[in-house]
Amino acid sequence: MVQEYDVVVIGAGHAGIEAGLASARRGAKTLMLTINLDNIAFMPCNPSVGGPAKGIVVREIDALGGQMAKTIDKTHIQMRMLNTGKGPAVRALRAQADKVLYQQEMKRVLENEDNLDIMQGMVDELIIEDNEVKGVRTNIGTEYRSKAVIITTGTFLRGEIILGNLKYSSGPNHQLPSVTLADNLRKLGFDIVRFKTGTPPRVNARTIDYSKTEIQPGDDIGRAFSFETTEFILDQLPCWLTYTNGDTHQVIDDNLHLSAMYSGMIKGTGPRYCPSIEDKFVRFNDKPRHQLFLEPEGRNTNEVYVQGLSTSLPEHVQRQMLETIPGLEKADMMRAGYAIEYDAIVPTQLWPTLETKAIKNLYTAGQINGTSGYEEAAGQGIMAGINAAGNVLGTGEKILSRSDAYIGVLIDDLVTKGTNEPYRLLTSRAEYRLLLRHDNADLRLTDMGYELGLISEERYARFNEKRQQIKDEIQRLTDVRIKPNEHTQAIIEAKGGSRLKDGILAIDLLRRPEMNYETILEILEESHQLPEAVEEQVEIQTKYEGYINKSLQQVEKVKRMEAKKIPEDLDYSKVDSLASEAREKLAEVKPLNIAQASRISGVNPADISILLVYLEQGKLQRVKQ
């Protein structure tokens, strides 16, 4: 008997989990298929979640009603706020995960989710009828019919592990690869690229000499990614810092001919921002040393991840490298590092909803779209799940703009510009990063999460209370006038500020660079009455008000361009005077509006002006296909 679902999700990694949960929570009957149920939410590379830009994505997923933040809050072994000495736009949370606990907690959540079935099975083929996906077929011939399919296959598509001169078919961590589905996608006409990533060796904690390394503790205050988290893990495990040296580099130099990276065995493009140790040695050979972080993989294992030592060198060379590193001279290697090549689709073949242009109701999310990182995958996953469910249920799709979220930046970059290497999200990619902060992810996206049915009534009530408290406190400080008495002058001078000549509104005093919210309370002789997150918002919104308003003005200009819609079926060959490169790129990307068209590489301002003229004169409707 053929089983029927609204949505089928292929894969149960970080993209698949968020896609499946979002789809089910929106009310779609959802099936998640995975090669091995024991590897749900597996972390094949680094045992961490978050970091610059990525940590903000985790907060955004949480604000939309996703799961990653809640799970890492329950299962981390260490948490740190990064870039605390810099402005709020680049601050981000990073957590070290207990990999096994993280998997177990995610599996528990999935198994207890209404509307979601989980099944072990390898999908070999998509069922396509009239350029529309109708379901999937597994390697044992089982058919699952559905109204939409989301592919979240990670690095499994035609995966090959490479170690020295050894190369064999495999998914990450020596799991089964997905070869037949990869061939199926090629047969369906998708433009496929070959990418590469890698992982470092793991060593036994009992054999590390930590006295030769530098301790890297977590923060000693409770931190969390999720708005819902109220209990914090304070019993944390440290990481440790060590370095490569001249001896390490000599081992690499002597054996560079054995590296798959430089022997020609690896054809795929690797990640620019996470290079192998061989790559670092060659590209930055003026550097006398490179940082290595020793990261525990969990509370109940001795495996330690050697962050920064990703390699495809043979196993015996990896051992030689470890012997040269302070603290690791006698370390037992428990797993060798390796490189992995895999298939990815060219992401300009997608609409901003992550639906494929060629096949209706087929969505893709995660590393199959050319990205790297658990967080980037999860961010795409939740949007693919939201949109697939909204599509089949008729409840509407959502596209996050570049000013809404880092997830919006990520997806727009992929579908508009494409990528010729594994894409990593960076704060520098976001032109509105002062608006897209770690601290305001809930304020930006909780309303949307609630409208989509992914945020509970109880949580939404708490969120609205927080939002009102921020508004009320800013208004209160706007109404309170501080007198220039000796008490006030002494505190201001102690903070390095200049004495007041006249009275001043509390809100204006807070805008001074040397002032903070706590100092204002001290001047007013008041105690802390509000939650820390509310006080933080009051301070940031006040101090950066001018810059924030400038960014908002820029956003309004772009929104006016986004309002100028372009028909999906426009025939650009019939638009006179467009440059040939612009005509080709516009036909490939099929931008939905003038703003997106302006971001396409190869489309210049003159081409945009021509499109605007056609749009304003109503000519675009006449050149549709």
UniProtKB/Swiss-Prot annotation:
Protein's gene: mnmG
Keywords, sorted A to Z: Cytoplasm, FAD, Flavoprotein, NAD, tRNA processing
Binding of FAD, residues: 11-16, 123, 178, 367
Name of this chain's protein: tRNA uridine 5-carboxymethylaminomethyl modification enzyme MnmG
GO aspect biological process, one term: tRNA methylation
Keyword Oxidoreductase: no
Species of the source: Staphylococcus epidermidis (strain ATCC 35984 / DSM 28319 / BCRC 17069 / CCUG 31568 / BM 3577 / RP62A)
GO molecular function, one term: flavin adenine dinucleotide binding
Cofactor or coenzyme needed: FAD
Cellular compartments annotated: Cytoplasm
